[in-house]
């Protein structure tokens, strides 16, 4: 719950959940799963931008923008704050947006060096090296209905002088991503490198490379 002291109609309510389960497959081979969801309501709301990963590092040779400016936001909602809904690999930030989101992340984690050694190693680097395969699925939306008219990410707006044309893009609220990557602890930082493909409306999108620093999940 949040409220500005100087504003009467600034109440914001946020409810969310983050549930994780780690299943041992064989020795150090792990199947990790996460379900996260959140909703905000009240006169003022929190907008969630879905897409990308936490602490995504912008690379000088990358030509993919981190935030998709072409996906519109509902101008009729009073958004007081913003947050990222991650992980949704295969996309830039803002592939979907709204005051609600839900997503599932599923990963197979293989600490390859430690697995074949059969015991923990003295080297933090060798001990932490992992290969991963992952699949993400999720959606972000406004209102009660993910397919409702409150979702402006479903609109495409064309402007030609004084003429403005809005077309229903027929986008499905659900997006998915899959791929693989590597993890390692280097100089005290846990580094993640992922290569992912997004699936939007049944189409597989061009791959996106992510370099990030995060221990979460």
What are these model-predicted stretches?
Residues 1-128, 133, 141-144, 155-164:
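C-terminal outer-membrane beta-barrel translocator/porin domains of Gram-negative envelope proteins
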Residues 17, 129, 176-180, 191:
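One face of beta-strands
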Residues 30, 190-192:
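Membrane-spanning beta-strand positions in outer-membrane beta-barrel proteins
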Residues 136:
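Short basic (Lys/Arg) and small-residue
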Residues 143, 192-194:
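Short small-residue beta-strand/loop micro-motif enriched in glycine and branched aliphatics
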Residues 144-180:
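A short alpha/beta connector and helix-capping loop motif
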Residues 184-186, 206-217:
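Outer-membrane beta-barrel "beta-signal"
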Residues 196-201:
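A short, acidic, flexible beta-alpha connecting loop/helix-capping segment that sits on the rim
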């Amino acid at each position: 719950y949040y409220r500005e002291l100087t504003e009467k109609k600034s109440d914001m309510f946020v409810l969310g959940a983050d549930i994780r389960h780690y299943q041992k497959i064989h020795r150090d081979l792990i199947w990790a799963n996460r379900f996260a969801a959140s909703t905000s309501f009240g006169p003022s709301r929190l907008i969630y931008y879905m897409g990308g990963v936490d602490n995504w590092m912008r690379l000088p040779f990358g030509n993919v923008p981190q935030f998709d400016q072409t996906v519109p936001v509902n101008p009729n909602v009073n958004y007081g704050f913003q947050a990222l809904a991650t992980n949704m690999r295969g996309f830039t930030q803002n592939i979907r947006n709204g005051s609600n989101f839900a997503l599932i992340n599923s990963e197979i984690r293989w600490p390859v060096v430690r697995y074949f050694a059969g015991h923990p190693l003295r080297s933090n680097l060798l001990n932490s090296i992992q290969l991963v395969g992952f699949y993400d699925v999720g959606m972000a939306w406004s209102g009660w209905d993910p397919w409702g008219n409150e979702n402006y990410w479903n609109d495409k707006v064309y402007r030609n002088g004084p003429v403005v044309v809005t077309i229903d893009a027929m986008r499905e609220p659900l997006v998915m991503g899959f791929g693989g990557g590597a993890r390692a602890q280097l100089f005290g930082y846990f580094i993640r490198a992922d290569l992912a493909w997004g699936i939007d409306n049944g189409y597989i999108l061009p791959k996106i490379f992510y370099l990030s620093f995060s221990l979460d999940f």
